[in-house]
């Protein structure tokens, strides 16, 4: 049996990005084919949004210039609005704290793993992890009932702070081109950590059934491809 949560982020990334033969249609698992419970789906998503809010707040505090602080405050506002709107989508009489509680500890561990050692790594972490996780939850939400799916997708795609983060990263790299190599390396590490979080969102912290990892890999490849395009736009090698 494969235990992804015992593997390093680099091993996870290598597994997902290596060359592969085409998987038979019947063996491939599409995230859209899974049918998560709405309360559990939103509980996971809200727990992650909460730690993103904490990360964004720290990035505002550590920002080196007034302009950077202003940009990141706006990104923080966007994440806060998203969190509020997702809470409103919980089933009636569902306690938001109760929905998040089973997932919050793992979300906090994830946040610590991707925190970075300085402000530049913090901002790239926000850019990479929120991009990957948004793509993941949009795809994973495809298995929700139509009305719930449409409402969640609207919230997740309506407004993002990505352009603001990109602006700060591009400005930093132009000012100090030597940052690019370190940022590219950090970005690759972030992919592994975030893919692991996505896998656990589907399977939970337990052994996967035989072959489950292999069946999910093609679904994650689409998400990694979108990440690669975002890194290319920054001039960083994904």
Per-region residue spans from a language model:
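Short, extreme N-terminal leader segments that mark the start of a protein/domain
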Residues: 1-68, 72
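Conserved alpha-helical segments that form or flank metal/cofactor-binding pockets of metalloenzymes
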Residues: 2-13, 75-103
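Acidic/His metal-coordination segments adjacent to aromatic residues that form catalytic metal sites
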Residues: 23-43, 102-126
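Alpha-helical scaffold segments that form or flank carboxylate-/histidine-based iron centers
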Residues: 36-42, 66-81, 119-122, 147-161, ...
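Helix-loop segments that flank and shape redox-cofactor active sites
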Residues: 52-73, 114, 130-145
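Internal, conserved structured core segments that host functional sites
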Residues: 110-159
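A contiguous pocket-lining binding segment that forms or flanks enzyme active sites
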Residues: 138-195
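Extended, helix-rich structural scaffolds rather than catalytic motifs
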Residues: 179-238
